[in-house]
Design a protein with these regions (language model features):
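Solvent-exposed, amphipathic alpha-helical segments
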Residues: 20-28, 73-81, 108, 112, ...
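N-terminal intrinsically disordered/low-complexity leader segments
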Residues: 1-12, 195-197
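Amphipathic alpha-helical interaction segments
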Residues: 16, 91, 108-111, 146-153
């Protein structure tokens, strides 16, 4: 009996590779995201991934873009709901902190900076900039750009050092999120959630 392998389209193959790379990033850190490891994870050859991404740097750049899309989509949805009073403003903070922490964005960013591959961060930075511009439309009275700057930097710092720093200060590991939530409510006037009826 022979096994028939379903042939993936180039886009499906790229998507599978990016999801595998993201899973490796979350499971084992950025050093585990290699063309060889991703290829093994999805049952493709190293040469196949070279064809799709050109190099390990190309894979990292695409992974950054992929993570950036997920991050900005989730944050944008959370902000819209919070502005309408349909979600706790904490959701905006949680999605931002999770993107850099649990989703591996902070480790990926730090690794790229340390390895000299800063250009690979451009897709994330561009997507965040576009999101902030959209969120700022009609809200000229709110410091959306400044709020985004401190929130992203707080989330990035928390992803890299937050738990250890909180422990050293005898604070709960979630303290940075609590502080960020208070600052977010104060700085942009997001509504507290309405009680559900």
């Amino acid at each position: 009996m022979s096994i028939v392998r379903e042939r993936l389209t180039p886009e499906e193959s790229r998507s599978a590779a990016l999801e595998a790379a993201r899973a490796l990033l979350i499971e084992a850190g950025p050093q585990a995201v290699t063309l060889k490891a991703v290829a093994a994870r999805i049952g493709k050859t190293h040469a196949n991934l070279l064809h799709h991404f050109g190099s390990a740097m190309g894979l990292q750049s695409e992974l950054a873009r992929h993570i950036g899309e997920r991050v900005t989509r989730g944050i944008g949805e959370a902000v819209a709901l919070a502005r309408a009073g349909q979600a706790d403003p904490r959701e905006v903070v949680d999605r931002t902190f999770d993107a850099f922490g649990r989703e591996g964005g902070g480790a990926l960013a730090a690794w790229m900076i340390i390895s000299g591959n800063r250009d690979a961060l451009n897709p994330i930075l561009e997507q965040i900039h576009n999101l902030v511009d959209r969120l700022g439309e009609g809200h000229d009275d709110r410091p959306v750009h400044e709020t985004t700057l401190w929130l992203v930097l707080a989330a990035l710092g928390d992803s890299l050092l937050g738990e250890a720093m909180a422990g050293a200060l005898s604070l709960p590991k979630e303290k940075a999120r609590e502080i960020a939530r208070r600052h977010l409510i104060a700085s942009v006037g997001l509504a507290e959630p309405r009680p559900r009826t």
